[in-house]
């Protein structure tokens, strides 16, 4: 099973309109999406937070958590965790792992494509980072995020909506402008 196919990638980033055969395949390789599909297939039998642990172990990521810092996470009530997103999905997995260790009901606003990971679907509120906040593909996610907070459930947000990129004009890696909804 694949998390994302060439066709889905092409549609999501509007490559399908360019009529350039092979470009989606090339991007799947360059963006390591084929590797992600392989790692998922190897761990698809694991559910929930143990799935995150298996993925992190599979890709060789270790995390050290200061137990004293975990005490800063409110034990009840809604809050919003805001994080940068420099590398991609890894930040989402780590944020889920850390916050859910204290608040198992935590939800994360995430790219709608991540909803294809059935092992973690319960944790995601899908939005489309390739569209504006007012786009039909994001309105449902925004409503669900507001309901989540009203219900006292904590929510994680990556306000840039996409991974950081290298800006040649600034000679550094930067986030895209944050969504005005967050900051």
Task: Cite the ranges covered by each PLM segment.
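Membrane-anchoring hydrophobic helices of lipid-metabolizing enzymes
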Residues: 1-82, 92-94, 101-103, 121-122
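Soluble catalytic domains of membrane acyltransferases
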Residues: 62-183
